[in-house]
């Protein structure tokens, strides 16, 4: 299993960060990595996510929501083909630093046969996470 994890401190309360993160309709206006998310925000439901890593090929996939805990955590599991080929558990965790700051943790756990040989793609993915982190910080601090 390979894991990418990034974090950033956002000068906004947890509620503001959650609102921006889960306003799927507005993602195309600020998010340079996740170009769109559509679907019902309910655990167990499939959503449609389109991403575009920097200098990488864009892709659209249909992960299942694993967690959607208001003001705390949003997590999904996506699979390439069948389970065990290339699976990604993507997560966003919000931790209250104080009333005016939030730690935004953004990561993904990759598993499956192809996860072991996908090094270059994972670096581009991490770059995409960091770009998104900067963008959500800017959007929340407006």
Language model features with spans:
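Short beta-strand micro-motifs in enzyme catalytic cores
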Residues: 2, 45-47, 90, 102
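Hydrophobic pocket/interface hotspot
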Residues: 17-21, 27, 47-49, 65, ...
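Glycine-centered small-residue hotspots that permit tight backbone geometry or close packing
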Residues: 42-46, 69
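A conserved amphipathic terminal alpha-helix motif
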Residues: 103-142
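Short aromatic-glycine motifs in intrinsically disordered, low-complexity regions
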Residues: 50-54
């Amino acid at each position: 299993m390979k894991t990418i994890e990034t974090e950033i401190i956002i000068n906004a309360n947890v509620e503001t960060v959650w609102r921006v993160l889960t306003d799927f309709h507005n993602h195309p206006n600020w998010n340079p990595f996740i170009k769109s998310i559509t679907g019902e925000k309910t655990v167990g439901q499939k959503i449609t996510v389109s991403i575009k890593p920097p200098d990488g090929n864009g892709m659209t996939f249909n992960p299942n929501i694993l967690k959607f805990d208001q003001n705390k955590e949003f997590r999904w599991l996506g699979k390439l083909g069948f389970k065990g080929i290339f699976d990604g558990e993507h997560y966003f965790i919000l931790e209250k630093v104080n009333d005016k700051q939030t730690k935004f943790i953004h990561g993904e756990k990759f598993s499956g046969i192809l996860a072991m040989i996908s090094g270059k793609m994972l670096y581009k993915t991490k770059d995409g996470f960091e770009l998104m982190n900067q963008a959500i910080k800017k959007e929340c601090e407006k």
